[in-house]
């Protein structure tokens, strides 16, 4: 039974990731006035499966000078963390009902840094190492703003439990009442998942392919799956935090559909941003966080600390 539960939890995520790659190629294609994949299957719908078969049947090569154990463990760790992040998410029911769900998510997103660092170092390539160091600096930096924004949301919510956020947002979504936080959170998630315009780790023009330059076949596919699973997970977390309750009178299946639609909308915005904006320069990326986001998030956090004290408020779910 446990294995069945695990499979029913992992397979839909991997299917969603597979079709996200197809949607991305289609959306980017239409935005650039071309068709995108349309050969394999009707309207190119079987393209992700063809890619998966091709990648997993090829021989996994590795550089002679690489560190074998770390080189193999890095993609496995990346995919494991990307799948584990989903466990506490209420959609509307979660696999693990954690009281400290948000801390769990924050800790796991911090752990993903190690897989990138291992892959860059174990490849024994200067391009991979530079890409990995960029990724680590970027991820750790933007986690600071993510943590402070989460703290502000938790001060409004009154607990670290994700399920209570739907009660908090019964009247108004937090994306309306705390829009500066939501805006900074969304931009920080773009940086956290290494997406354009913050994709400095995979800068093709300067670093060939970044930290995964020496990976091929299966291990490369695992990094690819981890990246896209993280994108969907981050947008699901954004939906829970800022676009919570759907007011459907406990109709679980309708709740799930509305949750899915909101997450899809945010994911499409990720693709739109990728198609629209050029890559940031590295110093601009760091200045955006340390000189703009950090002072703003700290000021807003202090505001949300002082507001309940000044108005003698109690958490919404009590």
Swiss-Prot record:
Q: What is its main location?
A: mitochondrion
Q: What is its EC number?
A: 7.1.1.2
* Intracellular or extracellular location(s): Mitochondrion inner membrane
Q: Name one GO molecular function term.
A: NADH dehydrogenase (ubiquinone) activity
Q: Which UniProt keywords apply?
A: Electron transport, Membrane, Mitochondrion, Mitochondrion inner membrane, NAD, Respiratory chain, Translocase, Transmembrane, Transmembrane helix, Transport, Ubiquinone
InterPro entries recorded: NADH_UbQ_OxRdtase_su1/FPO, NADH_UbQ_OxRdtase_su1_CS
Q: Give the membrane topology, semicolon-separated if more than one.
A: Multi-pass membrane protein
Q: Identify the PROSITE patterns for this entry.
A: COMPLEX1_ND1_1, COMPLEX1_ND1_2
Q: Which parts of the chain span the membrane according to its record?
A: 3-23, 68-88, 100-120, 136-156, 172-192, 222-242, 253-273, 294-314
Respond yes or no to whether keyword Disulfide bond is given for this record.
Answer: no
Tell me which GO cellular component terms the UniProt record holds: mitochondrial inner membrane
Summary of the function given for this chain in its UniProt record: Core subunit of the mitochondrial membrane respiratory chain NADH dehydrogenase (Complex I) that is believed to belong to the minimal assembly required for catalysis. Complex I functions in the transfer of electrons from NADH to the respiratory chain. The immediate electron acceptor for the enzyme is believed to be ubiquinone.
Stored PANTHER family: NADH DEHYDROGENASE SUBUNIT 1 (PTHR11432), NADH-UBIQUINONE OXIDOREDUCTASE CHAIN 1 (PTHR11432:SF3)
HAMAP family assigned to the protein according to its UniProt record, in alphabetical order = NDH1_NuoH
Per the similarity annotation, which family is this?
Answer: Belongs to the complex I subunit 1 family.
Q: What is this protein called?
A: NADH-ubiquinone oxidoreductase chain 1
Organism, by scientific name, is: Sminthopsis crassicaudata
């Amino acid at each position: 039974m446990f294995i069945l539960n695990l499979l029913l939890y992992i397979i839909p995520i991997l299917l969603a990731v597979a079709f996200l790659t197809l949607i991305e190629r289609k959306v980017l294609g239409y935005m650039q006035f071309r068709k995108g994949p349309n050969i394999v299957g009707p309207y190119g719908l079987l393209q992700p499966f063809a890619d998966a078969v091709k990648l997993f049947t090829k021989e996994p090569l590795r550089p002679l000078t690489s560190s074998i154990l770390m080189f193999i463990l890095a993609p496995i760790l990346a995919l494991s963390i990307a799948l584990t992040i989903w466990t506490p998410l209420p959609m509307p029911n979660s696999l693990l009902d954690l009281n400290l769900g948000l801390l769990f998510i924050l800790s796991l997103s911090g752990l993903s840094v190690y897989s990138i660092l291992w892959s860059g170092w174990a490849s024994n390539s200067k391009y991979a190492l530079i890409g990995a160091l960029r990724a680590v600096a970027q991820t750790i930096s933007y986690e600071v703003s993510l943590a402070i924004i989460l703290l502000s949301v938790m001060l409004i919510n009154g607990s670290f439990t994700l399920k209570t956020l739907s009660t908090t947002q019964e009247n108004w979504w937090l994306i309306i009442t705390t829009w500066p936080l939501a805006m900074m959170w969304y931009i920080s998630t773009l940086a956290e998942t290494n997406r354009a315009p913050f994709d400095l780790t995979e800068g093709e023009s300067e670093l060939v392919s970044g930290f995964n330059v020496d990976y091929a076949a299966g291990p490369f596919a695992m990094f690819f799956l981890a990246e896209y699973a993280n994108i969907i997970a981050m947008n699901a977390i954004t939906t829970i935090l800022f676009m919570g309750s759907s007011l459907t009178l406990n109709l679980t299946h309708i709740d799930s559909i509305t949750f899915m639609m909101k997450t899809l909308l945010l994911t499409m915005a990720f693709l739109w941003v990728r198609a629209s904006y050029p890559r940031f320069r590295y110093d601009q990326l760091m200045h955006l966080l340390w000189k703009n986001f950090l002072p703003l998030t700290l000021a807003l956090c202090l505001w949300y600390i002082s507001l309940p004290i000044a108005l003698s408020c109690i958490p919404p779910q009590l």
